[in-house]
Amino acid sequence: MNITEKTDEEILALARPLWRDLVKYSNEGKYGEFARNFSSSLARAIDQVVAGHQFANSELARNLAEEIDPLGIIRRGEHVTVVYRQRSTKKPGEWLGRLVLGYEDGKVRIFGASIF
């Protein structure tokens, strides 16, 4: 099944625990756990040294709030992008979270994730 064929509710149910884990392991600075649900292409593309530097030096990346607000879902090709409102526990304001999901070897994997 193509993930784009799922309902919004089904996609959000798949996305929520994946985003929750990204927030948790980002806050803890645990790159190995942070990347455990990445697609093979995303895992190859992200340099562990750069990611480790980001965890060590980004106040935002180490202080993400657990509460999120899903803002929408975009379907394209074989992937969906879930957009979230993300907050920090230390910095005032709101950020845009982006989580790109698709199937790889029959499992839902993360093909992209970022906070703007």
Give residue spans per PLM region.
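Short, low-complexity N-terminal intrinsically disordered segments enriched in polar/charged residues
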Residues: 1-28
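Boundary/linker segments of alpha-helical solenoid repeat arrays
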Residues: 46-50
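Surface-exposed, charged secondary-structure patches
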Residues: 52-103, 112-116
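Localized chelating/binding microdomains
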Residues: 18, 43-45
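Short, well-ordered alpha-helical segments enriched in acidic and aromatic residues
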Residues: 27-41
